[in-house]
């Protein structure tokens, strides 16, 4: 379980090999307004740990959080990485190209990332931007890395819709920040996969 978390730093979107981590890391990715910051806050049980911008795509920062977990009375540290949302409408084309290139370098060369959490709005499960993101991650995924699909805002679905979604995406997790649905399951998967306890 996650017992504490703290903000470490914010970085402009670019790869810097000097900014390495001693901890295994979890990267949260998804399109703008999918609920990345809210999910991090819910998992860490802190309302304002990760702050979301009122204007999607306005912030070009990668935010790092040090998270302390406990498993069988033993404590471990991992980092959560809150990445800028994909698919911003209010960013110039040139800035978007630079942004995407820098994110590309960061994701490919950040070897401490062990788990990519791809957040998808449960009401819009087959958007082209999400299909492309999934394909993109698979192209450079290393043997020690995994992708986990997490469907957000599941409080908007009825039971049959949830069952249908879970049946289609069998290894995914459905969550709701509003009623805390699925958060315990997600927390367990994050800890086990990031620290290698699932092997």
From Swiss-Prot:
SUPFAM superfamilies: P-loop containing nucleoside triphosphate hydrolases. GO terms for molecular function: GTP binding; metal ion binding. GTP binds at residues 30-37, 57-61, 82-85, 152-155, 175-177. The keyword Amino-acid biosynthesis does not apply. Mg(2+) binds at residues 37, 59. Residues 22-196 form the EngB-type G domain. Keywords: Cell cycle, Cell division, GTP-binding, Magnesium, Metal-binding, Nucleotide-binding, Septation. It comes from the Bacteria. InterPro entries: G_ENGB_dom (IPR030393), GTP-bd (IPR006073), GTP-bd_ribosome_bio_YsxC (IPR019987), P-loop_NTPase (IPR027417), Small_GTP-bd (IPR005225). NCBIfam families: GTPase_YsxC, small_GTP. Necessary for normal cell division and for the maintenance of normal septation. Belongs to the TRAFAC class TrmE-Era-EngA-EngB-Septin-like GTPase superfamily. EngB GTPase family. HAMAP family: GTPase_EngB. This is Probable GTP-binding protein EngB. The lineage of its organism: Bacteria, Pseudomonadati, Campylobacterota, Epsilonproteobacteria, Campylobacterales. The gene is engB.
């Amino acid at each position: 379980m996650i017992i504490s978390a703290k903000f470490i730093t914010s970085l402009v979107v670019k790869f810097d090999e000097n900014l390495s981590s001693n901890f295994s890391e979890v990267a949260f990715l998804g399109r703008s307004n999918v609920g990345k910051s809210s999910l991090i806050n819910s998992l860490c049980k802190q309302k304002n740990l990760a702050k979301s911008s009122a204007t999607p795509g306005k912030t070009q920062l990668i935010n790092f959080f040090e998270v302390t977990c406990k498993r069988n009375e033993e404590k471990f540290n991992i980092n959560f990485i809150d990445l800028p949302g994909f698919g911003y409408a209010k960013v110039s084309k040139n800035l978007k190209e630079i942004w995407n290139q820098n994110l590309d370098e960061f994701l490919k060369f950040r070897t401490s990332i062990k788990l990519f959490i791809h957040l998808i709005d449960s009401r819009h499960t087959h958007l082209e931007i999400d299909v492309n993101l999934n394909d993109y991650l698979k192209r450079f995924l290393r043997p020690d890395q995994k992708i986990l699909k997490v469907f957000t805002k599941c409080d908007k679905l009825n039971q049959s819709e949830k069952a249908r979604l879970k049946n289609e995406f069998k290894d995914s997790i459905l969550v709701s920040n509003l009623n805390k649905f699925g958060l315990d399951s997600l927390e367990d998967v994050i800890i086990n996969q990031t620290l290698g306890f699932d092997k």
